[in-house]
Amino acid sequence: MKTFALHILSPDRTFYDGECESLVLPIVDGKYGIMADHSNTIAAVVPGELSYRTPDGRTHYAAVSAGMVKVEDNDVMVLVETAERPEEIDANRARRDADAAKEAILQKKSIQEYRSAQANLARALSRLRVKRGSK
């Protein structure tokens, strides 16, 4: 299968830098799939589950937060605030974060606080999905 260069970066580290056969990541419109020879594009990444298949046939998963993806000439760059492998996720902390976000949503504060709580909830739930999916 044809491959492309994939770079997944966050402010504090290079999460992955290597060849890839396919990539699926969360964008505003849903899950977005990328394979070799994909058309050039730029899209906003939303909190959720990212997966990519390496040339050895293994599929890897990560919980990502908001960011962007740029596809250009078989070179894909994913820039996100955070990217976590399943083994890096503390499920108890993610549950606490989800509970706190749900409580904040119910408190009916300003629109900005409401949207922030929604984003926190989405991130916590995606972290839990990635953690559960790794077992």
Region spans (language model):
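Compact, glycine-rich, soluble single-domain proteins
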Residues: 7-100
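N-terminal export/targeting signal detector
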Residues: 1-7, 133
